[in-house]
Amino acid sequence: MKRITSYRKNAICLLASLSLGSFLVACSTTQPNYQTVGNLNNLNQLQNLHAKATPSKKQMTGLHAQALQDIAMSIGAQAGLAWRSEQINQVLSKNASNLDRIFNFNLILLDHNVVPPVLVQGNSSLNLADAQTLRIDDRAYQIISQAHFITAPPQWRNYIWMDYQHPELPLPAFLPKTAEERIIWKKYATIGWQDGVQQADAIFNDNLARLTRDYNGMALYRRLLLKGMVSKPFVAQTDLGITGNNSALHINDQLLRITSLPKLQINPGRWKSIVTHDSAPTKE
């Protein structure tokens, strides 16, 4: 009978470990009536986060240690991401005026609140179709994002502002309570923190690259448009006059649709000769 009871108890704990929160509540060596000590404002405070310590009544199990590691790494990663995001945002705020000048989307918007397409340019590319075919070009252009309507001009903040909040403090039942548990917590919270900081840097770098690509790609479209190497989007306008019902009234109601998206002009006979500092090909 004792063996059956012991077997059932172990099975319950094993199943509960599939859910991290359930495991810590069901299989903890102590009751979850503790007070959280510390906060998540910096790495040192994170490392020393714990519940008010009580004497350990039994040796910590491997499953409990693994659960503690998982929570420490998860909380550490979220806290590190939020901390690094705040640092990045402080730098962005100090340089806001310069960024407003560099990434001024108002200068490249099209009529009718249309955002230009994003183009990318490649130079001197080689493409090997097969062992007997090699394709060479001096320059290549590609539309990677098409024109579309917006209600407000894009801003650099839409791309690179880091909006990551600090995680909530975990319940005391999920925190280390003994010296042995605090050693585990400190080690894996530090690993999680470092991962979170690296993740924040990676996210920012990716977003900055996307901002630069989109802005330069829209500016490239405007230059090629002047040369006749790409077409404008065609916007059809329908005047609806006065519309509405007993609850809403719309005066001079208009409906706009993009009926033709920009296309690259592959006929060089339609390119225009213009004076430009850009080295893109023009018709002579």
For the regions a language model picked out, list residue spans one by one.
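N-terminal Sec/ER secretory leader and immediately downstream segment
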Residues: 30-156
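Bacterial N-terminal signal peptides that target proteins for export
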Residues: 2-16
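C-terminal motif of bacterial Sec signal peptides marking the signal peptidase cleavage site
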Residues: 25-26
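Mature extracytoplasmic/lumenal regions of exported proteins
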Residues: 114-284
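Helix-centric, low-specificity signal for extended rod-like, repetitive segments
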Residues: 1-2, 77
